[in-house]
């Protein structure tokens, strides 16, 4: 039988689970002489994961540009992760037909100027992006 404080704590976690999201600033890295630009939509909690769409733009090689979905399993609430930091490992699913999903590692570094590091590991290389994030309140339907 659950104690009252445990029920209140669990209820508080559930009510705050989807109350916040990560907003990541657009960023870029270099691969040889090519600039690779990354844009990520709000990383929002859905079904135990942080989920966002992404867009990679490679101006010197448009065929290398890509869009897709990022899925990062998460065990904390967004506000807890934003305060404590941590590393999440998940998958980036490309919208390109027949593309293999790529591993993505997301390091949240609140004690380093709200820094975030995103590494996308492909068959050919690892793209390493450095950016900053803000924890924002999400709109509710109530």
Regions found by a protein language model. Give the residues of each.
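Sec-dependent, cleavable N-terminal signal peptides
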Residues: 1-5
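Central antiparallel beta-sheet cores of small beta-barrel/beta-sandwich binding domains
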Residues: 7-142
């Amino acid at each position: 039988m659950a104690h009252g404080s445990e029920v209140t704590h669990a209820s508080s976690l559930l009510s705050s689970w989807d109350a916040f999201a990560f907003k990541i600033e657009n960023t870029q890295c270099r691969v040889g002489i090519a600039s690779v630009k990354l844009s990520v939509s709000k990383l929002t909690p859905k079904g135990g994961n942080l989920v966002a769409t992404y867009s990679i733009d490679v101006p010197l090689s448009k065929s290398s540009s890509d869009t897709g979905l990022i899925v990062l399993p998460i065990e904390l609430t967004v506000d807890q992760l934003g305060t404590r930091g941590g590393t999440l490992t998940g998958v980036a699913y490309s919208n390109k037909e027949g593309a293999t999903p790529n591993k993505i590692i997301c390091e949240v570094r609140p004690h380093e100027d709200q820094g975030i590091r995103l590494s996308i590991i492909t068959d050919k290389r690892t793209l390493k992006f450095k950016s900053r994030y803000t924890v924002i309140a999400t709109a509710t339907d109530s």
